[in-house]
Amino acid sequence: MHDGPARQGKHQGIETPNILKINMERLVPDEPMPYDVPHELAEWSVQNTIHKAKHEDTDQMAVIHGSKYKDLRLECAEALEKIGYRLFLVANPEELLKRPRDLLEIIVSLRKAMNPNSALYFSFVELNFIPLLVYLGVDLFSQTGADFYAQLGVITTPHRNYDLKKYPLYDLTFEELKQYNRNSLDFVLREARAHIQNGTLRNLVEERCCSSPETMSALRILDRDYQEFLDSYTPLY
C-alpha cells in the first residue's frame, strides 16, 4: 500500500514502517567512513564495503556508504543489490538529519533507483523526522535514539525532546525513561501506519515538519525540487 512515496508492507513478517530490533552480528562487515570527507576516501569506503559483502549471508543487513556523495551512495546500493542484499542500513544518519538538502537528494535517489523490495533502515532518528522519512520511503527504524536520549535524561515526544532536568515533566528512573522513549517511537510508527492506511500521511508530515527548522526546511525543499518524485506516486482518477 502506498500513500505518496510511503510504503506499507511487510519485511520478514514485520509490518512496515516499524521498529527493527537487530543484533549487530547480523550487520554485514563494512568500511565505516565519516560524512564530510574527500570523494577519494568515500570511494575507498564504498569499494571496501562492497568487497567485504561479497561472501556474506545476503539475508543480513548491508550498509550503504558513500558519505555525502549521491553518486557513491547509488553505486554502493546498486552493487549490494546485485550481490543479493535486500535490507540496507543508511550510513551517517545523524549527519543526514542535520542537512535536509543532502538527506533528500540521497534518500530520494536511493528510493528511485533501488528495487521496490529493498528495505531502508535508519539506525538513529529524531521522532519528529519519522513521518517525513516514512513519506520518503524509509521502512525500518532502530531504538538506538530512544535509548541514547534516555541515557542523557531526555524524554522524547512526537513533537520535540525535553531535558528532564530543565523540564521536570516526570520523575522517572533510567529504565522507566528508556521504556517511555521506546513507547514514543512505537506510537509514532503506529501513527504513521494508520495515516498511510487512511491516505492522510501528508497531513501528518506537514504537522510534524513545523516542529523544527530542519524538518520544515526538508519539506520545503521536497515540495520545490522533487515534485516529479512525489507526482510519480500520486494516483490518477
Q: Which residue stretches match the model-derived regions?
A:
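Charge-dense, low-complexity intrinsically disordered segments
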Residues: 36-43, 97, 175, 179
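Glycine-rich phosphate/ribose-binding loops and adjacent secondary-structure elements
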Residues: 59-176
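Short, solvent-exposed loop/turn motifs
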Residues: 13-15, 160-166, 201
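C-terminal extensions of enzymes
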Residues: 2-6, 18-23, 30, 168-237
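A structural motif corresponding to the C-terminal end of an alpha-helix
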Residues: 51-60, 83, 113-116, 191-198
